[in-house]
Structures are given as structure tokens and as C-alpha cells.
């Protein structure tokens, strides 16, 4: 099992790269919205308005991403020996004989770390909600597309 400190560092790097990319795209959209060519040619021309909507949406996503980075950076990597699953836990699940490893983090949900061997889940996600408070040996159930999935918590690190 990879170390949680290494996974945290990898997640922070991944989120940082994503933030830089989004900030570059946001700057380009803002420049496009205020560029001379974006001025409406008639009352039906909405290029500048569309660019401003896109810029506003990107700005909101940038704020969310910065909050995720701050949450992950502040994540305490405490011991989970004989403790229930909480933020910062590295969890190994078994579902029908197939093992999966998850990192419960405050941001970066869906990211794959350690060459794809570890998936990041967040507390608001269905799986994150189902995992919170569980102990090793307990079963986790969640409904996906009308079908119940049952997993067993093998280890918490």
C-alpha cells in the first residue's frame, strides 16, 4: 500500500497542475471577452456575453479548486489503527473478490493516484458517505443505478 504522505503530495501536485491549466484558460477567455473583435456587431451578436458567462463559470471552478487544494494541504495524516474511517484514511475494499484502494480526501474526487492503483473519493460522494465511520471488517452498501453494491472494508491505513 502506498504511503498516505506520498499520495497527498501527488494529489496536491495534480490539483495544482489542474489549477494552472484552468487559470490559463480563464485568462484567455477574459481577454477574448474584452477584445475589440468581441464587440457586438448587432443586437443579435452575443459573443462577448457568452465569453463572460464562460469566464464566470471558470472563476467559480477556480475558487472550488483552490478550496480543494487548501483542504488537501491541511489534511492531517493521523493513524487509523482501531479507528473508524475518516478524512485522510487509505481504505482497501473487497467487492466480489476484487480489491480496490481508496483515499478519502476533502478534494480531488475521482482522481487516480499511484499509477492508477488508488482512487480519491470525497465525503459528499455516495461511496465517501457510505465509508465514513466504518471499521475494518464492516460491510459498506450503496445503490448505484438501482443496483445495490456490497463491499467489505479489508484494511484502513
Question: Could you say what each language-model-derived stretch is?
Answer:
Residues 79-147, 151:
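Non-DNA-binding regulatory cores of transcription-related proteins
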Amino acid at each position: 500500500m502506498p504511503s498516505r504522505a506520498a499520495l497527498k503530495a501527488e494529489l496536491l501536485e495534480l490539483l495544482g497542475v489542474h489549477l494552472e491549466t484552468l487559470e490559463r484558460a480563464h485568462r484567455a477567455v477574459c481577454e477574448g471577452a474584452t477584445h475589440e473583435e468581441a464587440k457586438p456587431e448587432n443586437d443579435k451578436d452575443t459573443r462577448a456575453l457568452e465569453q463572460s458567462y464562460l469566464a464566470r463559470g471558470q472563476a467559480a471552478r477556480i475558487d472550488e479548486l483552490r478550496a480543494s487544494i487548501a483542504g488537501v494541504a491541511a489534511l492531517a495524516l493521523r493513524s487509523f489503527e482501531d479507528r473508524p474511517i475518516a478524512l485522510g484514511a487509505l481504505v482497501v475494499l473487497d467487492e466480489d473478490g476484487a480489491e480496490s484502494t481508496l483515499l478519502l480526501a476533502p478534494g480531488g474526487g475521482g482522481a487516480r493516484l499511484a499509477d492508477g492503483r488508488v482512487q480519491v473519493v470525497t465525503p459528499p460522494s455516495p461511496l465517501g458517505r457510505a465509508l465514513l465511520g466504518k471499521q475494518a471488517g464492516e460491510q459498506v452498501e450503496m445503490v448505484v443505478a438501482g443496483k445495490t453494491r456490497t463491499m467489505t472494508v479489508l484494511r484502513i491505513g
